[in-house]
Design a protein with these regions (language model features):
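Structural motif
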Residues: 2-6, 71
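Alpha/beta catalytic cores of nucleotide-metabolism and tRNA/nucleoside-modifying enzymes
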Residues: 29-56, 60-142
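Short, small-residue-enriched loops and turns at beta-alpha junctions
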Residues: 18-24, 61, 84
Length: 142
């Protein structure tokens, strides 16, 4: 199906961080599968401003954000870390968390040899484990 005929501008991949039900795939695993499928049918290109993938669920660190970007996400949502920072330290906690995440992203990008976010691509990740089904995932009767 042609994307334009459906007026689809993007998708949101969201779950509960895969904490609630065992054998459920994490948001990162689903992101990996979805972006591979979207690329295969020509709906997702790295520089395509007309289609975006957003993801959230289980994102806790700057490295998690970079992994999602490398796998094709245009934006990454975080809930729990910001709620915890707000509850514990108020506005200062939010600002401090944002600074920590920023520093984690900058340091990780330097270690990967990337100067800009558009240089963070899937080939900087070891995705072999994402190709494997979770134990019991396919055979589970629950």
């Amino acid at each position: 199906t042609e994307r334009g005929s459906l007026s689809i501008r993007g998708i949101v991949i969201s779950n509960h961080g895969a904490r609630q039900i065992d054998t459920v795939k994490s948001a990162v695993q689903l992101l990996y599968e979805c972006t591979r499928a979207l690329k295969k049918v020509g709906w997702l290109g790295r520089d395509d401003p007309e289609f975006s993938v957003f993801v959230d669920g289980g994102v806790r660190r700057g490295t998690d954000i970079l992994k999602c970007i490398a796998l094709g996400a245009r934006a990454v949502g975080m809930g729990r870390p910001f709620m915890t920072a707000m509850a514990a330290f108020g506005e200062e906690g939010i600002a401090r968390l944002a600074d920590i995440l920023h520093q984690e992203i900058i340091v990780s990008m330097r270690l990967m040899g990337c100067r800009r976010l558009d240089e963070v691509k899937e080939d900087v990740l070891d995705t072999r484990a994402l190709d494997l089904p979770l134990p019991g995932y396919i055979r589970s009767r629950y």
